[in-house]
Curated annotation (Swiss-Prot):
Gene3D superfamilies: Pheromone/general odorant binding protein domain. This is General odorant-binding protein 56d. One of its GO terms (biological process) is sensory perception of smell. The gene is Obp56d. Residues 1-15 form the signal peptide. Disulfide bonds join 35-67, 63-114, 105-123. The keyword Magnesium does not apply.
């Protein structure tokens, strides 16, 4: 149970700051649990990611990020969906703030779609104070 709670915390990139609805939290929790199981990440890896530790280059962690971002519609086949990101985060954080972070992060490209997702997650995490 603690593992699922940890996942729900890391999944929406500062969910508390964004004040997600109960429904949004439930969806994030379910998607996170599914992706964690699918990719086989450990509790320690989830905690590290939640705490902003992006030193883990384990492909499982990177593919977890990809799985989650695809489930919520932010990525499709490694490509950022800027309209979806703005539609989902804009009402929570303000469109101008989200657009500013998008300008910094959305051109991120990694070696493959999992690496791209991980780098994108890291960029959004590091710029979360702006959204």
């Amino acid at each position: 149970m603690k593992f699922l709670i940890v996942l729900s915390v890391i999944l929406a990139i500062s969910a508390a700051e964004l004040q997600l609805s109960d429904e949004q939290k439930a969806v994030a929790h379910a998607n996170g649990a599914l992706c964690a199981q699918q990719e086989g990440i450990t509790k320690d890896q989830a905690i590290a990611l939640r705490n902003g530790n992006f030193d883990d280059s384990d492909p499982k962690v990177k593919c977890f990020a990809n799985c989650f971002l695809e489930k919520i519609g932010f990525l499709i086949n490694g490509e950022v969906q800027p309209d979806v990101v703005l539609a989902k985060l804009g009402p929570l954080a303000g469109e101008d703030a989200v657009k500013a972070v998008q300008a910094k992060c959305d051109a991120t490209k990694g070696a493959d779609k999992c690496d791209t997702a991980y780098q994108l997650f890291e960029c959004y995490y590091k710029n979360r104070a702006h959204i």
